[in-house]
Amino acid sequence: MMLALGAWMGLAATAYSADYTIGISIWDVSNNPSSVPIIAGMNEAAKAAGVKIVVSDPKWDASAQVDNIRDFVTRRVDAIAVFPIDVVGVLPAVHEAEKAGLPVIGALGKIEGIPYVGVDDLEYGRVHARLMLEALKNTKGPKRIGLFRGTAGGSPDRLRMQGMQEVFKASGADIAIESVTADWSPEKALTGFQDLLQRFPNKGDLQLVASMGNCMIPPSIDWAEQNGRDEIIFTTMDLCKSDVDAVQKGTLYGVAFQDVHDMGKLVVDTLVAMNKAGDYHTLPEFARNPPIIVCTKATFDNCKGRGF
């Protein structure tokens, strides 16, 4: 699905100049909470740079994303940014675009062989694991963590998990992880959480529940409160508005997050800078190592970033 000017809540493709056009395929525009601020950030950067962006919505369909990229090739956009659903499945279309002379970058998900704009997901996982260990510092003995995962096989999920496991192993803590494949969906995460509570019905059986991000944790916090399981500690990655409220209330211990609005700006700014430099292989210095921010209730007032 291609989004034209003003087609979706004023956040979709916005034309500012016909001189340079960026085609963008992003996971799911209507059902993925973080897509809204990302697209807003991209529009802001496009307006400032005087370029045009065209946003396509594959709706979490990997084959549709492949079609998006091929359509961009047919339309002869100047560059393509892909927020990948399937980092392997998208490769043939990426290679076709490159053979056609169109530069492609991966955004918030690494695609083999092309530049990547986004946080280091391996380090993102490490940072979150350290936050979880901090949250569990007063918990003695073995620890069981429920973890809401993203899309199986996607590089953000895989690399974040790898980073978490590295930190847990190095800590020497006795930690068991109960993974819930939630596909970045708050609804699927809640269903998985309800299953965890059935499997571990006694207080103390499940010490902490964490999320890979995308606003998956708040419904489970509410469910825990409603069902007398408020002893469970919660942490998450990413920062949506309901996460903000939960941290301030103290029902969410803390958050490790990237500012997704700024990440949207960064994607466009990076391609504009690459075009000006005539080099689509090397990331500009400003696009390397975007910050990962950690906030808890104790530090929240001093934290910078946007909830979505």
PLM regions: where:
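Bacterial N-terminal signal peptides
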Residues: 1-12
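Immediate post-signal peptide segment of exported/extracytoplasmic ligand-binding proteins
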Residues: 14-23, 47, 136-144
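Hinge/cleft segment of the Venus flytrap/periplasmic-binding protein
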Residues: 18-20, 152, 156, 167-168, ...
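Structural detector of well-ordered beta-strand residues that form the stable sheet scaffold
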Residues: 23, 54, 103-105, 146, ...
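Hinge/beta->alpha junction and helix N-cap segments in small-molecule ligand-binding domains
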Residues: 25-40, 55-64, 86, 118-128, ...
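Short, hydrophobic alpha-helical segments
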Residues: 49, 73, 132-137, 197, ...
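Flexible loop/hinge segments that line or gate small-molecule binding clefts
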Residues: 52, 87-123, 130, 134, ...
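Hydrophobic alpha-helical
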Residues: 70-73, 78-98, 164, 178, ...
